[in-house]
């Protein structure tokens, strides 16, 4: 990767009863293409008395993408969706004008030892879709485009790249790509397949570029779309994400994303007044925090 512009470290963040590694936003780089938020969950080893319990909370102006490496999460939302997500599958929830959802350990796992590891991602919506009706789409792992080239394994989790299109129904030009090596190192050259802004997240293993070695838990932001050439060690996994940025700035407060600060202010009042749609089967209420997202 011959044109690294910014290197972002993973930073610890508390999301209630669960610690995560925050990758975006970052003070020097608030977004990459339409991607405005990425949390790395785990890897966590939960005892039989420990569970993931993220109670009902709201979103506007974005789509959430949940992708697991290990474990399982049960998703419920105010649209009526109720589904378990397992490794390799994708949950894509578009908040639009407003949605509420919860994420919890499935009931059948709540009294067992378990592992949880994955990514939680927010993708901003185009301005004309920020007030759209909410929707939810689940894509099974078997339906995600996957292929092998010269011993390197690729998955196009979302978006368009390499002449392929993921079935995940995204709303703008973007890509979210998994690249894995096996027991051999590999040279990667994919600059011509990308567009817009680009970044690379190292999940495990190491990559080398221009004599430098980069280890896990860092995002490398490219100066342009050409994440040109880099070498992956054996047993390395990276995620490349990005796409075309929007012309308007995006503002973030708590779980709200929008190009208009007044829309966020209205969403804050609506959540305080409990005017957001409810999640069937859920009764908890999370108060609006006093501070904005860092």
Model-predicted regions and their roles:
Residues 1-294:
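Jelly-roll (double-stranded beta-helix
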């Amino acid at each position: 990767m011959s044109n690294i512009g910014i290197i972002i470290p993973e930073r610890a963040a508390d999301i209630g009863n669960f610690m995560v590694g925050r990758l975006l936003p970052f003070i020097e780089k608030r977004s990459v293409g339409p991607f405005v938020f990425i949390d790395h969950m785990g890897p966590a080893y939960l005892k039989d008395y420990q569970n993931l319990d993220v109670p009902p909370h709201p979103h506007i102006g974005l789509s959430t993408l949940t992708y697991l490496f290990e474990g399982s999460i049960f998703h419920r939302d105010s649209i009526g969706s109720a589904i378990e997500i397992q490794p390799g599958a994708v949950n894509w929830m578009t908040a639009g004008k407003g949605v509420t959802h919860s994420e919890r350990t499935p009931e059948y796992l709540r009294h067992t030892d378990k592992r949880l590891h994955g990514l939680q991602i927010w993708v901003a919506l185009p301005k004309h879709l920020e007030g759209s009706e909410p929707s939810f789409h689940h894509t099974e792992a078997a339906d995600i485009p996957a292929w092998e080239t010269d011993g390197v394994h690729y998955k196009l989790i979302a978006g368009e790249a390499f002449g392929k299109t993921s079935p995940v129904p995204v709303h703008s030009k973007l890509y979210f790509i998994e690249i894995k090596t096996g027991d051999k190192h590999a040279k990667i050259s994919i600059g011509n397949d990308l567009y817009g802004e680009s970044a690379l997240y190292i999940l495990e293993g190491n990559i080398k570029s221009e004599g430098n070695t980069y280890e896990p838990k860092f995002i490398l932001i490219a100066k342009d779309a050409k994440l040109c050439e880099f070498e992956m060690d054996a047993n390395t996994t990276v995620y490349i994400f990005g796409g075309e940025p929007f012309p308007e700035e995006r503002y973030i407060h708590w779980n709200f994303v929008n190009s208009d600060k007044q829309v966020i202010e209205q969403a804050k009042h609506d959540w305080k007044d409990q005017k957001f749609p409810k999640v069937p089967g859920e009764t908890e209420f999370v108060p609006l925090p006093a501070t904005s997202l860092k």
